[in-house]
């Protein structure tokens, strides 16, 4: 009995020591500390996933493979064979590229549990702002040559570099000076905003499916484990309060339903990744989760963001803000006498921007400025892409290492 107890105690100590060793190995596995080992595990995980996917498709996806092959062959023939259909095929391809581009940007924005690319700030937001400013400047919204005439990969919209005279005289001018109303601008950028929102909803599915699979197998997904084991003392002020809110959401998981998921998806917040994990962990039906996420992100949230940017860039809101600011300053002692001169200068600057023709510098100067701006912008995008790639590679390698460690731990426990 005594020897058995000693053996059991030494076995527990060995398992505990191995578990601590495994945790340290996972923590230290990053591209900065162990680049070769991290890349090796990432490649192993990728190959394993591809093999598993191919095996599954060969075993269960006979009809899927057949239909996909037929569609690819038909599409290839339509694209390569010349004929009267060529123009229509090219138009369809433009719409496909346009749709895939904005959906992919949405997926990239939301995938990776908060570590994704901020594509709204990089692409959709600037696109809406530039279109609004151009429409306000030209006094009309018929700027696009087609719905897909937007910012895309290696492509600038045709309307961006055109002067207002090329579109014709302004069509929307009112006595108040608000040239283009919100209701006219919104439909022009609405489709790409909704497509981006659909992409963000699709990007929330992997955490749900991973958590759902973990729940069915009886285990807990990484995000839930980290939340359970996280301490509020080792974080900053914001992280501490965010963890408290997450814990509150975790303890009130019985309230998760269509409406609560819809509310969480509709408002920009850092809690939705956790909500997706919890919905999978606690068995919320897929369609209930996905439809609430889709409506919240693709309809409500994107419209809130789009309308906000249009209002900020629209002349109407600027006029309202100017009037409110003047009213506030008029009540400040000493500033009331300065207001007429300040207002006149503001109006002169605004009229100069809106009504004066844009200066035409020399061809060389334009090229230099474009090159400089493009270089800075591309540098920012590439830095964010690099950061995104590093996070994905590290997370995949760490997950693969954890699976290996679990097998090692299971072998050790069974051998005892």
Swiss-Prot record:
One GO BP: endomembrane system organization
Record field: transmembrane: 61-81, 102-124, 258-278, 290-312, 324-344, 373-393
Lumenal side stretches: 82-101, 279-289, 345-372
Modified residues (N-acetylglycine): 2
Cellular component terms per the entry's GO annotation: endoplasmic reticulum; endoplasmic reticulum membrane
Subcellular location, record wording: Endoplasmic reticulum membrane
Keyword terms, alphabetized: Acetylation, Endoplasmic reticulum, ER-Golgi transport, Membrane, Transmembrane, Transmembrane helix, Transport
Keyword Glycoprotein: no
Bilayer topology: Multi-pass membrane protein
Keyword tRNA processing applies: no
Organism superkingdom: Eukaryota
Cytoplasmic side: 2-60, 125-257, 313-323, 394-416
Function statement: Involved in the early secretory pathway. Required for the correct export of secretory products from the endoplasmic reticulum (ER) and involved in the maintenance of ER integrity.
Family: Belongs to the VMP1 family.
Protein name: Vacuole membrane protein KMS1
């Amino acid at each position: 009995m005594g020897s058995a107890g000693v053996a059991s105690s030494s076995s527990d100590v060995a398992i505990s020591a191995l578990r601590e060793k495994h945790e340290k190995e996972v923590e230290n596995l990053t591209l900065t500390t162990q680049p070769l080992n991290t890349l090796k595990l990432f490649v192993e995980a990728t190959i394993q996933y591809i093999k598993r996917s191919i095996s599954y498709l060969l075993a269960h996806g006979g009809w899927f493979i057949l239909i996909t092959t037929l569609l690819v062959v038909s599409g290839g023939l339509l694209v390569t064979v010349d004929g009267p259909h060529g123009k229509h095929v090219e138009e369809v391809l433009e719409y496909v590229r346009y749709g895939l581009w904005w959906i992919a940007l949405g997926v990239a924005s939301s995938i990776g549990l908060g570590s994704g690319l901020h594509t709204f700030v990089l692409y959709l937001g600037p696109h809406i702002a530039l279109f609004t400013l151009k429409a306000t400047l030209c006094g009309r919204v018929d700027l696009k040559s087609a719905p897909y005439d937007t910012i895309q990969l290696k492509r600038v919209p045709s309307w961006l570099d055109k002067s207002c005279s090329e579109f014709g005289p302004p069509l929307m001018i009112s006595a108040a000076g608000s040239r283009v109303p919100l209701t006219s601008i919104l439909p022009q950028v609405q489709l790409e905003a909704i497509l981006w929102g659909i992409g963000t909803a699709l990007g929330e599915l992997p955490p749900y499916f991973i958590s759902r699979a973990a729940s069915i197998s009886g285990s807990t997904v990484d995000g839930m484990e980290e939340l359970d084991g996280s301490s509020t003392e080792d974080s900053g002020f914001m992280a501490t309060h965010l963890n408290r809110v997450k814990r509150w959401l975790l303890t009130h998981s019985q309230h998760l339903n269509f409406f609560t998921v819809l509310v969480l998806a509709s408002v920009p917040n850092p809690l939705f990744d956790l909500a997706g994990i919890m919905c999978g962990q606690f068995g919320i039906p897929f369609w209930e989760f996905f439809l609430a996420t889709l409506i919240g992100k693709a309809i409500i949230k994107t419209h809130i963001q789009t309308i906000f940017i249009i209002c900020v860039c629209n002349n109407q809101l600027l006029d309202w803000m100017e009037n409110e600011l003047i009213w506030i300053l008029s009540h400040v002692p000493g500033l009331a006498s300065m207001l007429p001169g300040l207002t006149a200068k503001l109006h002169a600057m605004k009229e100069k921007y809106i009504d004066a023709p844009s200066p035409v510098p020399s061809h060389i100067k334009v090229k230099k400025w474009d090159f400089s701006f493009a270089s800075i912008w591309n540098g920012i995008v590439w830095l964010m892409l690099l950061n995104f790639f590093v996070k994905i590679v590290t997370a995949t390698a760490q997950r693969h290492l954890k699976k290996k460690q679990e097998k090692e731990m299971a072998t050790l426990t069974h051998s005892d």
